[in-house]
From Swiss-Prot:
The protein's name in its UniProt record: Bifunctional heparan sulfate N-deacetylase/N-sulfotransferase 1
Consequence of changing C818A: Loss of sulfotransferase activity but does not affect deacetylase activity
Substrates-to-products reaction catalysed: N-acetyl-alpha-D-glucosaminyl-[heparan sulfate](n) + H2O = alpha-D-glucosaminyl-[heparan sulfate](n) + acetate; alpha-D-glucosaminyl-[heparan sulfate](n) + 3'-phosphoadenylyl sulfate = N-sulfo-alpha-D-glucosaminyl-[heparan sulfate](n) + adenosine 3',5'-bisphosphate + 2 H(+)
Enzyme Commission number(s): 3.5.1.-, 2.8.2.8
Listed result of changing C828A: Loss of sulfotransferase activity but does not affect deacetylase activity
Record note on what altering C751A does: Does not affect neither deacetylase nor sulfotransferase activities
Residues bound to adenosine 3',5'-bisphosphate: K614, T615, G616, T617, T618, S712, W817, K833, G834, R835, K836, Y837
Gene: Ndst1
Membrane-crossing residue ranges in chain numbering: 18-39
């Protein structure tokens, strides 16, 4: 109050002019203060959901970002999250989303795609206290920024709690505001710019593969770039570029010199603002440096969990040595250039050596100058690695006799010995990759017989395209490596005549497909041809420029190894690829073209009876065999009527072995082959293997009460004198604890686990469509088999039907239905079927009822979802549960 009284007395003594002067000073001071707070940060509109619809409006004042509180960043916690990437895409077919997925797939990183929700449910982020995702990627960062409050808070809390980062892309369009603030962040965007001369911030903590020593001179693709600006310490530029024009970017200042400044096209959020680390891109992945930095961003934000080591192994095969036509082969100067380039490449790749594949029959079949080149090449024989093709460059799948194949190989080996070519490299390549995949058994056997081959390579497994899916496998003791192309083919021999122009080849090398192949694959085996090393020597040009480019822009450590050691290294890294996945050769035209014409896909079965065991599969097998159009497999000497191909060691014998169990069809339209292997049902590998080889097959499974199935299996083992089953009661087996002996636990698992019906059917549904699977009621099959067989025939769609009411008869001695023969006789299953054994004890029945309760509930839900009728035993069980 005294201060207020003093102010009043002062005002009485001031003249009106003095009061106006003081007001003027106060207003001027206010303007300076306001200017500091309003323009210390550039103004901008938030690109919210409505931002694209308006190009006008006054931006709200923004306080200086340095005044915002700094939040601690949760360190990446690998043990608390699964190594899975959650990718939010605009649509399943959006280009950027597909490019993101392609890089993840090429790197063999697991991912899950979701359509980005504007409003709606967020995928479940945790499971039993563990994070389900190690990284979040948004194809459109505005979908993240404009999430509804509930989902945004849910996602942000997850990221903070589990140390999960976010990668986002901002792709401007014609409706984007030229300058705007990202809603909720101290970050400004300036969009629809043309940029040039991109450089890398050497201080960025993000960099791993990327080497920051170069500047990408020239215009960046597109005129829809966005750059980022902030003075908050949480933001660190990663890539920077200049604007193309001399005009300054609005809100960055009026100084004419500012147009030459570098602006961030990729920015890293260190998480100091809200505890979440992010990497934001101001465009899509069309610019090759964005792909490189994206790989580093994935590595950084996952604490290197989703990253490859810096080592890259490269092997360059030169196929068709001596094979080329006149005018396409190497001359003396070309051979010298090959040798000199090899030495040059060794400055960046220790011991780099070209790998030469030869067919000796064509030695000295060129011009005189080219024949001289052949001679000089052989004088350098110790300077290169060598591997054999076929003597006459014939495709191995055309040879059906192994001895003839071996004779061809022996001729090539004789040529090698005569000319001092080493024959112990253990590597061979078949012309056109014939016989490698699909497997031609005779080729593998002849290779081992003549050459002791341990390694080969192909571009055909599992398919030629897309190349990122190519994998390796091991068959018959021979390691098969994936082979890559490099943009060079037999007809690409002149630089100026390269398809699409020479710039296309340079684009492939400098940040394009060839660069990405090395970037995303720890081991690359490249296929080139003799013709690529004559004339303009495009092979030498390609790999010299590729290695220089990799050295300039990346920290990759380029290395090489001889083929056998390289294959061993490959399967150390990708041990999960050792087992092959056999596919239907007729589903891929390229595969069919290099598959023996003596083989036919019509020998493959169209129906699988998958089990489980002790549910009536053998009876169904007998009933199906009574149909004139249905033929079962030939019996196996080891496993009787069951082939057991897809679930065990027989799978590695290959599809030729499998087809031998089925006759060559006399009528491909009506003949319908089937096989029954009851172990398939609960196998973890059988569904995927079966779907790959038999993608159109129908699948039958029979279900009885899982408690009865468990008891039947126990009694089956007792009948076969299993010492564990004879030693322990059924109740002791099913209630055995974790400390029980391994043999007892094994018997327990075989009793109980096949009864997890829903779990196993779900696995089959992940490989086959629901309309390819029919679930049969095992209880009904036992009591009314004719009715069940009518359902089966309808499901199979056979052209002729059998009235099983007239062909089946009940045998009271056996206690089940048998085939009715002429004269009223019956043909029944063997003595091992239909055994009589004591009823299950009540304690075991009660235990199993409780044990299978949740499994049976899940089964009912699954069958309802599949649109299939619930078995009678399941309906009764569920009614008694209520």
């Amino acid at each position: 109050m005294p201060a207020l009284a003093c102010l009043r007395r002062l005002c009485r003594h001031l003249s009106p002019q003095a009061v106006l002067f003081l007001l003027f000073v106060f207003c001027l001071f206010s303007v300076f203060v306001s200017a500091y707070y309003l323009y210390g940060w550039n103004r901008g509109l938030e690109p919210s959901a409505d931002a694209s619809e308006s190009d006008c409006g006054d931006p709200p004042p923004v306080a200086p970002s340095r005044l915002l509180p700094i939040k601690p960043v949760q360190a990446v916690a690998p043990s608390r999250t699964d190594p899975l990437v959650l990718v939010f895409v605009e649509s399943l077919y959006s280009q950027l989303g597909q490019e993101v997925v392609a890089i993840l797939e090429s790197s063999r990183f697991k991912y899950r795609t979701e359509i980005a929700p504007g409003k709606g449910d967020m995928p479940t982020l945790t499971d039993k206290g563990r994070g389900r995702f190690a990284l979040i990627i948004y194809e459109n960062i505005l979908k993240y920024v404009n999430l509804d409050a509930w989902n945004r808070e849910l996602l942000d809390k997850y990221c903070v709690a589990y140390g999960v980062g976010i990668i986002g892309f901002f792709k401007a369009n014609e409706n984007s505001l030229l300058s705007a603030q990202l809603k909720g962040f101290p970050l400004f965007l300036h969009s629809n710019l043309g940029l040039k001369d991109c450089s890398i911030n050497p201080k960025s903590p993000l960099l791993y593969v990327t080497r920051p020593s170069e500047v990408e001179k020239g215009v960046l693709p597109g005129e829809d770039w966005t750059v980022f600006q902030s003075n908050h310490s949480t933001y660190e530029p990663v890539l920077l570029a200049k604007t193309r024009s001399s005009e300054s970017i609005p809100h960055l200042g009026a100084d004419a010199g500012l147009h030459a400044a570098l602006h961030a096209t990729v920015v890293q959020d260190l998480g100091l603002h809200d505890g979440i680390q992010r990497v934001l891109f101001g465009n899509n992945l069309n610019f090759w440096l964005h792909k490189l930095v994206f790989v580093d961003a994935v590595a950084f934000l996952t604490g290197k969990r989703l990253s490859l080591p810096l080592d890259r192994y490269i092997l360059v095969d030169i196929d068709d040595i001596f094979v080329g036509k006149e005018g396409t082969r190497m001359k003396v100067e070309d051979v010298k250039a090959l040798f000199d380039t090899q030495n040059e490449l060794r400055t960046h790749i220790p011991n780099f050596t070209f790998n030469l594949g030869y067919s000796g029959k064509f030695f000295h079949t060129g011009t005189d100058a080219e024949d001289a080149g052949d001679d000089l090449l052989l004088s350098y024989v110790k300077e290169f690695w060598w591997f054999p093709h076929m003597w006459s460059h014939m495709q191995p799948h055309l040879f059906h006799n192994q001895s003839v194949l071996a004779e061809q190989m022996a001729l090539n080996k004789k040529f090698a010995v005569e000319h001092g070519i080493p024959t112990d490299m253990g590597y061979a390549v078949a012309p056109h990759h014939s016989g490698v995949y699909p497997v031609h058994v005779q080729l593998y056997e002849a290779w081992k017989q003549v050459w002791n081959i341990r390694v080969t390579s192909t571009e055909e497994y599992p398919h030629l395209k897309p190349a990122r899916y190519r994998r390796g496998f091991i068959h018959n003791g021979i390691m098969v490596l994936p082979r890559q192309t490099c943009g060079l083919f037999t007809h690409t021999i002149f630089y100026n005549e390269y398809p699409g122009g020479s710039s296309e080849l340079d684009k492939i090398i400098n940040g394009g497909e060839l660069f990405l192949t090395v970037l995303l694959n720890p081991i690359s085996v490249f296929m080139t041809h003799l013709s690529n090393y004559g004339n303009d020597r495009l092979g030498l040009y390609t790999f010299k420029h590729l290695v220089r480019f990799l050295h300039s822009w990346t920290n990759l450590r380029l290395q090489t190894l001889p083929p056998v050691q390289l294959a061993q290294k490959y399967f150390q890294i990708f041990s999960e690829e050792k087992d092959p996945l056999w596919q239907d050769p007729c589903e891929d035209k390229r595969h069919k073209d290099i598959w023996s014409k003596e083989k036919t896909c019509d020998r493959f079965p169209k129906l699988l009876i998958i089990g489980p065991q002790k549910t009536g599969t053998t009876a169904l097998y007998l009933f199906l065999g009574m149909h004139p159009d249905l033929s079962s497999n030939y019996p196996s000497s080891e496993t009787f009527e069951e082939i057991q191909f897809f679930n065990g060691h027989n799978y590695h014998k290959g599809i030729d072995w499998y087809m031998e169990f089925f006759p060559i069809p006399s009528n491909t339209t009506s003949d319908f082959y089937f096989e029954k292997s009851a172990n398939y049902f609960d196998s973890e590998v059988a569904p995927r293997r079966a779907a790959a080889l038999l993608p159109k097959a129908k699948v039958l499974t029979i279900l009885i009460n899982p408690a009865d199935r468990a008891y039947s299996w126990y009694q089956h083992q007792r009948a076969h004198d299993d010492p564990v089953a004879l030693k322990y009661t059924f109740h002791e087996v099913i209630t055995a604890g974790p400390d029980a002996s391994s043999k007892l636990r094994a018997l327990q698992n075989r009793c109980l686990v096949p009864g997890w019906y829903a779990t196993h059917i779900e696995r089959w549904l992940s490989a086959f469509h629901a309309n390819q699977i029919l679930v049969l009621d095992g209880k009904l099959l036992r009591t009314e088999p004719a009715k069940v067989m009518d359902t089966v025939q309808k499901f199979l769609g056979v052209t002729s039907t059998v009235d099983y009411h007239k062909t089946l008869a009940f045998d009271p001695k056996k206690g089940f239905w048998c085939q009715l023969l002429e004269g009223g006789k019956t043909k029944c299953l063997g003595k091992s079927k239909g055994r009589k054994y004591p009823e299950m004890d009540l304690d075991s029945r009660a235990f199993l009822k409780d044990y299978y309760r949740d499994h049976n509930i899940e089964l009912s839900k699954l069958l309802y979802k599949m649109g299939q009728t619930l078995p009678t035993w399941l309906r009764e069980d569920l009614q008694n549960t209520r």
